[in-house]
A protein has these predicted regions:
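Glycine-rich, aromatic-flanked loop segments that form ligand/cofactor-binding clefts
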Residues: 1-12
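Histidine-acidic metal/acid-base catalytic patches
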Residues: 10-21, 35-38, 42-46, 50, ...
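Helix-loop segments that flank and shape redox-cofactor active sites
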Residues: 57
Length: 178
C-alpha cells in the first residue's frame, strides 16, 4: 500500500513560504474560476468538449498561501451552477470524495450527467476526520468504498464516459520516491 499521508504533508506544506503571488483568498479563486468558466465553457460547447474539475488533492486548506476551494460536494455544486452547461462538469475522483465523508453512490446520483470522467480508486481513512487528514491508497477491494455499489451507480445513471483505475498501491520493486 502507498501511504498518501496528508497529516505528514500538512506540516511540511504549512511551513513553505507563500508563492510570488502572496496569499490568494477563496473569494479570489471563486471570482477567477467564474471568469474562466464564463470565457471557456461556451468555446468548449462549440466543439463538444467536456471540462471535468478534479477535487483538490491533498485536501489541505491552503498551499503556499494559495487557498483551495474544490474540497466539498457543496463547492462542486457551486462550480456546476456558475455556468450551467453540459460542458461544465466534474471528475468523480472516488477517493477524494470518499475522504470528504460522502457516500459515493449518492454523490454519483447527485452529479449524474455532470460526471465527465471517473477516477475509480479506493482509499482507507486513517484519521477519523472529515475531510480526512491521513489516508492510505488501497487496492480496489481493500478500501472503504463499496466498489460494486459505485460501479452500479455509474451504470444506473447511464454513464458512458472514461473510467480509469487510478492510484494503485506501490508494487514490489516500484518506487514513488523522486
Amino acid at each position: 500500500k502507498v501511504c498518501q499521508n496528508n497529516e505528514a504533508l500538512a506540516p511540511l506544506i504549512k511551513d513553505l513560504p507563500d508563492t510570488e503571488y502572496g496569499k490568494v483568498s477563496k473569494e479570489t479563486l471563486w471570482k477567477n474560476l467564474e471568469y474562466f468558466l464564463k470565457a471557456v465553457v461556451p468555446e468548449a460547447e462549440k466543439i463538444g468538449m467536456k471540462l471535468a474539475m478534479h477535487p483538490d488533492d491533498p485536501q489541505i486548506d491552503t498551499i503556499r498561501g494559495i487557498s483551495r476551494i474544490m474540497t466539498s460536494v457543496e463547492n462542486f455544486i457551486r462550480l456546476t451552477k456558475m455556468v450551467t452547461s453540459p460542458s461544465n462538469g466534474i471528475t468523480m475522483c472516488q477517493g477524494n470524495f470518499s475522504l470528504m465523508g460522502v457516500d459515493i453512490p449518492a454523490t454519483v446520483k447527485t452529479f449524474s450527467k455532470l460526471i465527465h470522467f471517473v477516477h475509480f480508486r479506493n482509499v482507507l481513512d486513517l484519521s477519523g476526520n472529515k475531510p480526512s487528514t491521513k489516508f492510505t491508497e488501497t487496492f480496489h477491494d481493500e478500501g472503504q468504498i463499496d466498489m460494486y455499489a459505485a460501479m452500479k451507480s455509474y451504470y444506473d445513471i447511464g454513464f458512458k464516459g472514461p473510467i480509469r483505475p487510478d492510484h494503485v498501491p506501490t508494487m514490489a520493486g516500484d518506487s514513488n520516491e523522486r
